[in-house]
Structures are given as structure tokens and as C-alpha cells.
Amino acid sequence: MSGALDVLQMKEEDVLKFLAAGTHLGGTNLDFQMEQYIYKRKSDGIYIINLKRTWEKLLLAARAIVAIENPADVSVISSRNTGQRAVLKFAAATGATPIAGRFTPGTFTNQIQAAFREPRLLVVTDPRADHQPLTEASYVNLPTIALCNTDSPLRYVDIAIPCNNKGAHSVGLMWWMLAREVLRMRGTISREHPWEVMPDLYFYRDPEEIEKEEQAAAEKAVTKEEFQGEWTAPAPEFTAAQPEVADWSEGVQVPSVPIQQFPTEDWSAQPATEDWSAAPTAQATEWVGATTEWS
């Protein structure tokens, strides 16, 4: 598909990105129409997709998108969570119309609906999950592009891009590659320089993981503030408190005099000691006298 042009050939960096994201890994099932895109089959039953065919169909899809004069006439759809963020980023980069989440039936066929649209091109993430927009596109003669896995049905799909459409990294990378090629063919960005947008922005992130990362970052910030307060704040305080230490040492001598006089005078004159000593002596004499009477 790229012909003899070296500019359109797949670079080594692109191959490494595909392999790192697992784009070449298909499923254990194979549709008969996807056999032409299969390279080999692993011992565990997983089919390996030919990345050369993936790159050729990616360029063909980019050419079809660029051929649309108004970018808003291109509808990009993803009902699965793994592709919703990528679809929104693709639409922001290329000017397409995104539909992330549930697709309202009748959007392409029911003119009474408030959300009725008449796009000129449709791009979906998964033909199996996005079967409703593909079916409606067939009613209105709408050309379609789809990211297809080894077991994806190709009914109503005009341009199938073979890839792994189950993994979050693979789906995000494919939408990133497609957006980059569209911008390159339009002349918005140059092929000589790398695109400043990273593929990580197109990856799906679990909300729970985002909350955990935010909590960890907040805890780290609190600990940093505590350490900075312990090591930096006391330095000026010690220098300012030095003259106060001399004042406290001088003031200790004043309350020492009444503390010594108060307990010594109270406890010195106590007649209680004489009373307690006299009481047992009197009792002793009485008991002695009693014993003499019995005798």
C-alpha cells in the first residue's frame, strides 16, 4: 500500500511501539475473513498479526479520512471504555466528531431524533461492540473503518485495520498512529520531526488507579512539607531564643524562698505526734490492770 516511497515505510520506532503495546497479539479464535492478516500461530493458540499488513491498512484508512473535506463529517465511535479516551483525543487532534460511550440507536437513520447526524465516514473501535452504528451505516451507504481483531466479524466493514482491539495500550496506540498519519498527510506536522504528543495520552486509565496515584502524590507532598518544616524552621528560632534562656535562669531564684519556708514552718509545730504517743500508753495500763483483776 505504501508503494516504493521510503517516506511511507514503517520505521523501526513504530515497530517497537507496536510490539511494546501488544498490537500484534490476536485472539485464540480466527474469522475466515481475517486469515489474510495472520502471520503465525503460537503454541498456546494465540494468533500473531502481520504488522506489515496493519501498517498498510492504517495508511489506507488515513488516506480515506484525509479525503473528507470537512473533518467534522468523520464520526469516530467507541462504546468500550478502553477506547473512549483515545476517541476523544483523536477527535481533538483531527477535528472529527466523537461518540464516546453508548451509541443511541437511530442516530444515523431517525431524522426526528435531536442527535441525528449525517456523517460521510465512520470509524469504530470494535466491530462486535459497535455493531449498531455499523448496521445503521449500511442503511445510509456510509463507508466504515474498523479496528479488527482476529475474531472480529467484517460484515459492513469497508476498511479493516488488523490489530489487537482488546488491550488498552494497543487501542490507544492505534488511534495515536492513525491521528499522526492523518496530520502528516494533511501537512499539519512534518515527517522529519517526531510528534510532540505522546501515546500515553491516548491510553485508557482506570479511575481507581487514578485515585490511588493522587492519594500517593498527596501523601508524598505532606511528608515533604513535614521534613522541610523540621529541618528548615528551627534554625532561626534557636538564634532568637538564646537571650530568653538567660532570663529564665535569673528568675528561678525568686520563688525558691517561699517554697522552703512554707513546708518547714507547718510541719515543725505539730502536736499530733504527742497525742499518738500518749494514747497507746494509756491503753496499755488499762489492759494491765484488767489482767490483775482476773488473777
Curated annotation (Swiss-Prot):
Residues 266-295 are annotated as: Disordered. The modification Phosphoserine is found at residue 43. Acylated. Acylation may be a prerequisite for conversion of the monomeric 37 kDa laminin receptor precursor (37LRP) to the mature dimeric 67 kDa laminin receptor (67LR), and may provide a mechanism for membrane association. Cleaved by stromelysin-3 (ST3) at the cell surface. Cleavage by stromelysin-3 may be a mechanism to alter cell-extracellular matrix interactions. Gene3D superfamilies: Glucose-6-phosphate isomerase like protein, domain 1 (3.40.50.10490). Residues 161-180, 205-229, 242-295 are annotated as: Laminin-binding. The keyword Lyase does not apply. Residues 54-113 are annotated as: Interaction with PPP1R16B. The modification N-acetylserine is found at residue 2. GO terms for cellular component: cytoplasm; cytosol; cytosolic small ribosomal subunit; glutamatergic synapse; membrane; nucleus; plasma membrane; postsynapse. One of its GO terms (biological process) is ribosomal small subunit assembly. CDD domains: RPS2. It is found in: Cell membrane; Cytoplasm; Nucleus. Monomer (37LRP) and homodimer (67LR). Component of the small ribosomal subunit. Mature ribosomes consist of a small (40S) and a large (60S) subunit. The 40S subunit contains about 33 different proteins and 1 molecule of RNA (18S). The 60S subunit contains about 49 different proteins and 3 molecules of RNA (28S, 5.8S and 5S). Interacts with RPS21. Interacts with several laminins including at least LAMB1. Interacts with MDK. Interacts with PRNP. The mature dimeric form interacts with PPP1R16B (via its fourth ankyrin repeat). Interacts with PPP1CA only in the presence of PPP1R16B. Required for the assembly and/or stability of the 40S ribosomal subunit. Required for the processing of the 20S rRNA-precursor to mature 18S rRNA in a late step of the maturation of 40S ribosomal subunits. Also functions as a cell surface receptor for laminin. Plays a role in cell adhesion to the basement membrane and in the consequent activation of signaling transduction pathways. May play a role in cell fate determination and tissue morphogenesis. Also acts as a receptor for several other ligands, including the pathogenic prion protein, viruses, and bacteria. This is Small ribosomal subunit protein uS2. It comes from Mus musculus (Mouse). The gene is Rpsa.
